[in-house]
Amino acid sequence: MKPERKLYAKIKKSITKISWIRIENNSLFGTPDLLGYTANGHFFTLELKVTKSNKVRLSPHQIAFHVKHPNNSFILVEHLGSGCLKLFEGSKVHELVACGFKLDACCLGLDA
């Protein structure tokens, strides 16, 4: 199983108060991996990334998506070495690309 698929399985198991829809889209590049729906009726997108180093690899299309849709979009990054999870706001995509996993996150772990 690919690392991002494993991360999705962790999310689905750990965060049950959100309805998750996995987006399998090969026709519109840059579309995030997940669409979340909260009990309050709010939608948001979540891009899943897994890294072995500080660098977080995002395609130009993924960066463009978060630049165009900075609100209610997030990027969840798992560091394989430490197992640490960090959640970043989509509006911080340029900072995430520049600073990598060392960038301060808006949230840590799946319990937050």
Model-derived regions: residue spans:
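Acidic-basic catalytic patches of nuclease active cores, encompassing PD-(D/E)XK
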Residues: M1-N25, A39
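Structural signal for conserved beta-strand scaffold positions within catalytic alpha/beta enzyme cores
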Residues: R22, E47, I75-V77
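Beta-rich catalytic cores
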Residues: G30
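Conserved catalytic cores of phosphodiester-cleaving nucleases, focusing on short active-site segments
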Residues: L34-G36, H42-K52
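Short strand-connecting beta-turns/loops that link adjacent beta-strands
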Residues: A39-G41, L80-G81
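Mg2+/Mn2+-dependent nuclease catalytic core
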Residues: T51-P70
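Nucleic-acid nuclease catalytic cores
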Residues: V67-K92
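Intrinsically disordered, low-complexity terminal regions enriched in charged/polar residues
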Residues: L85-A112
